[in-house]
């Protein structure tokens, strides 16, 4: 296809990804000078203590009834907020953290075809951490990107951070520095997987991360991949995307990431094209496994029913 990226393996096949010796220059799209000069500013939102803004344009109609506790829908062209709920409240973000991990690792421009090992250090990343990657598994850096973004593989994300120049500590430091660079003033990271409830952010901040991540061809490709199979130990292990919307032809998703912990609830962030408009959705702390996807569908249906309107509703300040 001429993208210069390592080729994807078809789902269900035990073929390793085709590795190519590539320069990172073709993988990362450089943001415009204007974007680099200043952080993205969202539409003005009231921040008075315990204040909620309920604003509705005359004749607009009913807002989407979302189940996510914190949410934001942003038009990336106009930078206008179409929908917001508790958009400036810092909360745990679970594996949405991996979007920042892969962003800073990609910017280090380490070889994608370099073979890396999954070690016991990657196993000891947190109580109850799920992973199907056996210690001793050999994977390329590209494959670790693939699994961390598509399947939210905890050991894959940790291995990427562990092999970052300076190790995990340096990677987390770079993640926080990148957050400041992007204007994510209410975001803080303590580790690279999202398993810690101390990895926190707001919907407003995460919209900036999603837009920055959308500039990376690696993140775009692997976060929207449908499936991939690897050899882990003695077994072939098939992985699938944790976001079922990538399988829907009716959805044009540019970049996405899911997350879940007990502290964070079910989370989903994405950049998608809906009704010819590019939007960022941030949906945090949904109460059910399928609620985050249902909320995304509610937003899409609302946008298609009310094209062209810019509405802000249910915005709460930090308590």
Question: Residue locations for each model-derived region?
Answer:
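Secondary-structure junction/capping motif
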Residues: 18, 128, 140, 167, ...
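Active-site-adjacent loops and short helices of periplasmic peptidoglycan-processing enzymes
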Residues: 40-204, 208-217, 274
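Hydrophobic alpha-helical segments, especially transmembrane helices
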Residues: 16-17, 99, 272, 278
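Domain-terminus/edge residues, biased toward the C-terminal soluble/receptor-binding domains
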Residues: 36, 184-188, 194-319
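N-terminal secretory targeting signals
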Residues: 1-70, 305-319
């Amino acid at each position: 296809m001429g993208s210069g990226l390592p080729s994807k393996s078809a789902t269900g096949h035990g073929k390793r990804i085709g590795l190519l010796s590539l320069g990172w220059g073709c993988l990362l799209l450089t943001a415009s000078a204007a974007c680099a000069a200043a952080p993205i500013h969202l539409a003005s939102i009231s921040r008075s203590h315990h204040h909620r803004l309920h604003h509705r344009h005359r004749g607009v109609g009913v807002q989407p009834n979302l189940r996510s506790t914190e949410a934001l829908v942003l038009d990336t062209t106009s930078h206008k907020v179409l929908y917001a709920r508790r958009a400036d409240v810092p909360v745990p973000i679970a594996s949405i953290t991996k979007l920042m991990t892969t962003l800073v690792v990609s910017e280090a421009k380490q070889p994608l075809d370099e073979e890396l090992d999954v070690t016991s250090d990657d196993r000891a990343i947190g109580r109850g951490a799920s992973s199907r990657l056996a210690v001793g598994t050999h994977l390329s850096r590209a494959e670790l990107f693939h699994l961390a973004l598509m399947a939210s593989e905890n050991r894959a994300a940790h291995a990427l951070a562990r092999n970052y120049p300076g190790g995990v500590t340096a990677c987390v430091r770079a993640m926080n520095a990148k957050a400041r660079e992007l204007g994510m003033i209410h975001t803080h990271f303590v580790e690279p997987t999202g398993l810690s409830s101390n990895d926190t952010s707001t919907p407003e901040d995460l919209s900036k991360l999603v837009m920055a991540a959308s500039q990376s061809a690696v993140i775009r490709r692997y976060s929207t991949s449908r499936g991939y199979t690897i050899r882990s130990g003695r077994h072939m292990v098939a992985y699938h995307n944790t976001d079922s919307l990538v399988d829907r032809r009716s959805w044009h998703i540019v970049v996405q990431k899911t997350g879940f912990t007990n502290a964070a609830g079910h989370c989903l962030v994405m950049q998608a094209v809906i009704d010819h408009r590019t939007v960022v959705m941030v949906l945090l702390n949904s109460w059910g496994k399928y609620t985050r996807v249902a909320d995304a569908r509610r937003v899409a249906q609302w946008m298609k029913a009310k094209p062209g309107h810019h509405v802000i509703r249910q915005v709460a300040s930090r308590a």
